[in-house]
């Protein structure tokens, strides 16, 4: 089985994040999806990224966590708080299959199915700080639902954008 997306949902330690970065950079043929730590404000997530020195053209950091329906908890706890990386891997695969790796898995086309609400509602001003600092936000977009709203890698330069790095990787491996 060829693996091109790597995530360890819900594990947000610096050691694991730097391990994923080392792994995907060593392979150079896959993409890492890192979950921001649970329960953090936008400024705390930015501090985490900066302090942990998370940087890679082969990875992204996604924020915030999301609530989804929980069929097992119906009646008692109908929602479950989940890390975003699994959803981002899913929307990435869906857009890869429908449009290609060159299309950013973000925007109103990137609705995260089964989600109900966000752990934290990122506003426009917060998005304007997080996005250029290479933190991909998930937003609730009126009329569409909860959407992936960023597609940046954890680096600036030629490979700032996820689809640029992934398209380059796709061409090299074809």
Predicted regions and their residues:
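A glycine- and small-residue-enriched flexible loop/hinge signal that marks low-structured segments
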Residues: 1-174
């Amino acid at each position: 089985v060829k693996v091109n997306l790597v995530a360890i949902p819900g594990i947000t330690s610096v050691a694991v994040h730097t391990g994923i970065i080392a792994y995907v950079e060593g392979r150079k043929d896959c993409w890492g999806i890192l979950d921001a730590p649970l329960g953090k404000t936008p400024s705390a997530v930015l501090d985490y990224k900066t302090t942990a020195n998370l940087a890679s053209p082969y990875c992204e950091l996604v924020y915030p966590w999301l609530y989804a329906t929980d069929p097992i908890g119906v009646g008692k706890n109908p929602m479950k708080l989940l890390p975003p990386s699994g959803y981002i891997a899913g929307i990435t695969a869906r857009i890869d299959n429908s449009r290609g790796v060159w299309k950013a898995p973000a925007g109103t086309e990137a609705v995260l199915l089964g989600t109900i609400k966000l752990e934290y509602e990122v506003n426009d001003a917060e998005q304007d700080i997080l996005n250029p600092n290479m933190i991909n936000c998930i937003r609730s977009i009126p009329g569409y639902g909860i959407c992936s709203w960023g597609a940046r890698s954890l680096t600036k330069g030629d490979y700032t954008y996820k689809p640029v790095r992934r398209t380059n990787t796709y061409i090299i491996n074809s």
